[in-house]
């Protein structure tokens, strides 16, 4: 039997870096990636036969857990009728109708009137800004520092010395970067200045509904609503990236969860801490992007929003978008099965599991005297090695990130698979039972001690890898 190390060495002979997405290489934590052979429920097993409780969950899609029988049956039954047609199917229509009806808040607002399926989250975000530019007749886009919207050129931009960004990846031209303006997250003052500095030039603001790629950093109370108000007052569209949060933090995603608070008690907070019920208003983004849960574990993406904007897409409008496997029957079958099974009991269970784990993590670090904060949105959460919870990218990357490697490998050796970067979110599923929770909890004391004993390294920027 070949080991994980041997397979990784072999992979590097044929695959750049040995992986097909950078974070999988364990560059941020060191060591050898685990090559997985099978998965069931809350557990994955590597090629050496070691079983792990899985807190990666394929980076979020698997809210029901791995290999849910009804999802598997849906995919197999569909595959028997054909893997792909390159033609319309009824499954596409059913999925679009389900999404348009499910993205709904407590006030009954349904902002997704049309849905276009693509194959990835990157495609969905790329298409959304193309739509925004056509609809507004403007070129500039605004993104927040630390937010991830895929690997299309307009998004691989870091904050420069001013507000105009510069490429964060090789191969991205400066001519592209000049059209992306990067501003600090949770900072309305800079955003307000931006609209003064670039009047009638900004097509859209694209924002992760709740950032989950620099750790989980919920928006300040009312921030999303004020961003929407500000953008709309200047004629810019608001694009809500719910690639991670969509159908994960609740059946209607983060937008529905947050705006529903306006009609609930003040204590019904989306994240840690209390908020006033006036902090949230029923703001409505113009466009949404989805992926992950929408495909039930298979490749998919989607753009949804107001009909007058969405109808600009070809063939009904001038904005070109196409894809050979867009709306493919296997992904739509898996997505439909997943979303139809994801009732309130599923989300309530995931929330209970997440809350139990968060409490245990906080207690373990507190008892050991190791600085750590945990932030969450629904069942989505992440840790930060800092005494104060980060509010933006600068604070997130100023944490004692070097402690995570020791923590990660201790948990791994105890049979718990975590994201191999401190900047990634942790994902539970409805398949988590008492046994899975117990294994995670039992692994924490040793892992926290390992983190606490990590040799100090100079604080500095260690960029997230995706």
Curated annotation (Swiss-Prot):
Cofactor: pyridoxal 5'-phosphate
Principal location listed in the UniProt entry: cytoplasm
UniProt entry keywords in alphabetical sequence: Cytoplasm, Isomerase, Porphyrin biosynthesis, Pyridoxal phosphate
Gene3D superfamilies listed in its UniProt record: Aspartate Aminotransferase, domain 1, Type I PLP-dependent aspartate aminotransferase-like (Major domain)
Gene Ontology biological-process annotations: protoporphyrinogen IX biosynthetic process
GO cellular component labels: cytoplasm
Pathway: Porphyrin-containing compound metabolism; protoporphyrin-IX biosynthesis; 5-aminolevulinate from L-glutamyl-tRNA(Glu): step 2/2
Reactions it catalyzes: (S)-4-amino-5-oxopentanoate = 5-aminolevulinate
Cross-referenced InterPro entries: 4pyrrol_synth_GluAld_NH2Trfase (IPR004639), Aminotrans_3 (IPR005814), PyrdxlP-dep_Trfase (IPR015424), PyrdxlP-dep_Trfase_major (IPR015421), PyrdxlP-dep_Trfase_small (IPR015422)
Keyword Cytoplasm (UniProt): yes
Record-level Gene Ontology MF annotations: glutamate-1-semialdehyde 2,1-aminomutase activity; pyridoxal phosphate binding; transaminase activity
Residues with PTM N6-(pyridoxal phosphate)lysine: 292
Subcellular location(s) per record: Cytoplasm
Name of a matching Pfam family: Aminotran_3
Enzyme Commission number: 5.4.3.8
Oligomeric and partner information: Homodimer.
Family listed: Belongs to the class-III pyridoxal-phosphate-dependent aminotransferase family. HemL subfamily.
Name of this protein: Glutamate-1-semialdehyde 2,1-aminomutase
Organism: Tropheryma whipplei (strain Twist) (Whipple's bacillus)
């Amino acid at each position: 039997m070949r080991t994980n190390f041997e397979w990784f060495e072999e992979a590097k002979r044929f695959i750049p870096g040995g992986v097909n997405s950078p974070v999988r290489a364990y560059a941020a934590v060191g060591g050898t990636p685990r090559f997985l052979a099978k998965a069931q429920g809350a557990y994955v097993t590597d090629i050496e036969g070691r079983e792990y409780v899985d807190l990666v969950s394929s980076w979020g899609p698997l809210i029901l857990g791995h290999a849910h029988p009804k999802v598997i049956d849906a995919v197999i039954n569909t595959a028997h009728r054909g893997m792909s047609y390159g033609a319309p199917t009824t499954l596409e229509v059913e999925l679009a109708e389900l999404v348009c009806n499910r993205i709904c808040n407590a006030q009954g607002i349904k902002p997704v009137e049309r849905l276009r399926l693509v194959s990835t989250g990157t495609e969905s975000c790329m298409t959304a800004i193309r739509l925004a530019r056509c609809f507004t007749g403007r070129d500039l886009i605004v993104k927040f520092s630390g937010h991830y919207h895929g690997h299309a050129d307009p998004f691989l931009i870091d904050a420069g010395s001013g507000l105009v960004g510069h490429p964060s990846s090789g191969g991205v031209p400066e001519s592209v970067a000049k059209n992306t303006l990067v501003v600090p997250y949770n900072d309305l003052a800079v955003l307000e200045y931006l609209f003064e500095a670039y009047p009638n030039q900004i097509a859209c603001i694209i924002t992760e509904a709740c950032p989950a790629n620099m750790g989980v950093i919920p928006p300040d109370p009312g921030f999303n609503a004020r961003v929407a108000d500000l953008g709309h007052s200047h004629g810019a569209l608001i694009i809500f990236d719910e690639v991670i949060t969509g159908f994960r933090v609740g059946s209607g995603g983060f937008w529905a969860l947050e705006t529903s608070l306006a009609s609930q008690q003040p204590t019904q907070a989306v994240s840690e801490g209390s908020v006033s019920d006036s902090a949230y208003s029923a703001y409505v983004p113009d466009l949404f992007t989805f992926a992950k849960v929408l495909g039930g574990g298979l490749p998919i993406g989607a753009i949804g929003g107001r009909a007058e904007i969405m109808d600009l897409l070809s063939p009904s409008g001038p904005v070109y978008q196409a894809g050979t496997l867009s709306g493919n029957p296997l992904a739509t079958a898996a997505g439909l099965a997943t979303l139809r099974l994801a009732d309130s009991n599923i989300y309530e269970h995931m929330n209970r599991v997440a809350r139990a784990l968060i409490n245990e993590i906080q207690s373990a670090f507190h008892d050991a005297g190791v600085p750590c904060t945990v932030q969450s949105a629904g069942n989505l959460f992440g840790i930060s090695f800092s005494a104060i919870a980060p509010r933006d990218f600068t604070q997130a990357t100023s944490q004692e990130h070097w402690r995570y490697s020791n923590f990660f490998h201790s948990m791994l050796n105890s049979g718990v698979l975590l994201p191999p970067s401190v900047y990634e979110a942790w994902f539970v599923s409805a398949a988590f039972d008492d046994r899975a929770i117990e294994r995670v909890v039992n692994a924490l004391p040793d892992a926290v001690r390992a983190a606490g004993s990590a040799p100090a390294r100079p604080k500095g920027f260690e960029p997230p890898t995706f």
